[in-house]
Design a protein with these regions (language model features):
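Short, glycine-/small- and polar/acidic-enriched structural segments
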Residues: 30-161, 167-172, 176-182, 198-205
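Small-molecule pocket liners
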Residues: 106-112, 207-211, 215-216, 291
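Cleavable N-terminal signal peptides
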Residues: 16-17, 27, 54
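Sec/Tat signal peptide C-region and signal peptidase I cleavage site
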Residues: 23-29
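Conserved C-terminal helix/tail region of periplasmic/extracytoplasmic solute-binding proteins
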Residues: 292-329
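Bacterial N-terminal signal peptides
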Residues: 11-23
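Secondary-structure end/capping motifs
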Residues: 221-303
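Pocket-lining segment of extracytoplasmic ligand-binding domains
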Residues: 88-89, 165-256
Length: 329
C-alpha cells in the first residue's frame, strides 16, 4: 500500500484498493500516483484500460481509489498524489493552488430522480434533503443549479459516492431524492417502473471528470503525462467507434474481476450510450469555456465567465502535443 493510502486510510471506503503494477522499461524512475475519488465500477472500465495501456508504454501508474473527489483533490494539493480525477474548479480558484486541469475525461450526463411516493417535481424538494456524489462534484453543481433555477433551497445535502450506491439507496428507500447516471436510470426503470420520476434538467455542457496535477509535476514529467494522455484518447476513440471494445479490454487486462453478472451485462449498454458524449479530443479551451459558463451559474466558480482565464485553470501543453501527433476527431 502506498503512502497516500496509509495517510488517509480512515477515509478510504471498504472497497478501495490499489492497482500498482510496474511496467518494463518505465519512462521515469518515479511512479505516477493517481488519486480517483470514487470506487471502481463499470463506468470507469475504459479509464482503467487506458491506464493499463500507459503501463505497457513504460509509465508506472499507481491508482488509489478514495472516498470522494474532495479527498483526491486534497491529496494532489498536499503532494500525496501526482494526478487527481475530478473537476476541482472551486479549489483552483479559492485556494490559488498550483494545480491545473490537463485533460477532460467526461462531460456531465446525469439524471436527477425522486421517489414519487414523496416528490413529483422540483418544487417538492424545497426544504428537503438530497444526495449527491461528493462535495464540489458535477452532481452537486447540477443539483445546486436546478435549485436556483426553480427557486428552492434544500434542507441538506448528503454525500454518497458512487452512482450505483445512490441507485441502490433509492431502491432500498434510504434516499428519496438524488442524481444518478445512465446505468442507474436503466436499473430504476427496470426494477421499479413508475416508482421514480426523472426531473427535467435542460441542456448542460460541462466537465464531469478531468485529470489535474501540480504544475511542477506536469513540467517535470512531461513525457509520462503525454503517454497517459495519448493512451486515454486512443482508448476513448476506440470505445466511441465500438462500445463492445470495453468488454474485450476488460477481459484482456482482467479488470473488475469481482463484477457481478448484472454489472457485466451493463457494460455494452452503458458505453453505447456514453460513446455519444465522450470527449474524443480531451476537452481543451472550448471545454474550459463551457465549464466557466456552467460552474459560475452553479456557484462553484465566482465572477463573470468572460473574465476567467483558461490558463488559470488548465495546462494544455500535453494535450496539444498529443492531438498534434494523433490528430483530432
Amino acid at each position: 500500500m502506498n503512502q497516500l493510502a496509509r495517510n488517509i486510510r480512515a477515509s478510504v471506503s471498504a472497497v478501495a484498493f490499489c492497482l500498482a503494477v510496474a511496467a518494463p522499461g518505465v519512462a521515469s524512475a518515479d511512479p505516477m500516483r493517481v488519486a480517483f475519488g470514487d470506487i471502481a465500477t463499470v463506468e470507469s472500465l475504459h479509464l482503467l484500460a487506458a491506464l493499463e495501456r500507459a503501463k505497457e508504454k513504460g509509465v508506472d501508474v499507481q491508482m488509489t481509489f478514495l472516498k470522494s473527489e474532495d479527498i483526491a483533490a486534497q491529496a494532489v494539493v498536499s503532494g500525496q498524489a501526482d494526478i487527481g480525477v475530478g473537476a476541482p474548479y472551486a479549489l483552483l480558484q479559492k485556494a490559488k493552488a498550483p494545480i491545473r486541469i490537463f485533460m477532460q475525461l467526461s462531460t456531465l450526463q446525469f439524471y436527477p430522480v425522486v421517489n414519487t411516493d414523496f416528490y413529483k417535481e422540483w418544487k417538492d424538494l424545497d426544504g428537503q434533503e438530497i444526495a449527491v456524489h461528493s462535495r464540489g462534484s458535477g452532481t452537486e453543481a447540477i443539483m445546486q443549479l436546478m435549485a436556483d433555477k426553480n427557486g428552492i433551497e434544500y434542507s441538506g445535502i448528503s454525500y454518497v459516492p458512487g452512482a450505483e450506491v445512490r441507485t441502490g439507496a433509492l431502491l432500498q428507500g434510504n434516499v428519496k431524492a438524488t442524481i444518478v447516471d445512465s446505468s442507474g436510470k436503466r436499473v430504476l426503470e427496470d426494477k421499479a417502473p413508475g416508482k421514480f420520476a426523472f426531473l427535467p434538467l435542460g441542456e448542460v455542457a460541462a466537465t464531469d471528470e478531468a485529470l489535474f496535477a501540480n504544475t511542477d509535476y506536469l513540467s517535470a514529467n512531461a513525457a509520462d503525462v503525454e503517454i497517459l494522455v495519448e493512451a486515454i484518447l486512443t482508448t476513448w476513440r476506440e470505445v466511441a467507434a465500438d462500445p463492445k471494445a470495453v468488454i474485450a479490454l476488460r477481459d484482456k487486462y482482467k479488470l473488475l474481476p469481482d463484477a457481478t453478472p448484472d454489472m457485466v451485462a451493463d457494460i455494452e449498454p452503458y458505453f453505447t450510450e456514453a460513446a455519444a458524449v465522450m470527449p474524443l479530443n480531451g476537452g481543451g479551451e472550448a471545454a474550459a469555456r463551457d465549464d466557466f459558463d456552467f460552474y459560475t451559474v452553479s456557484g462553484a466558480l465566482e465572477g463573470e465567465p468572460a473574465d476567467l482565464k483558461v490558463e488559470d485553470f488548465w495546462d494544455l501543453t500535453a494535450l496539444n502535443k498529443v492531438t498534434a501527433k494523433i490528430g483530432t476527431k
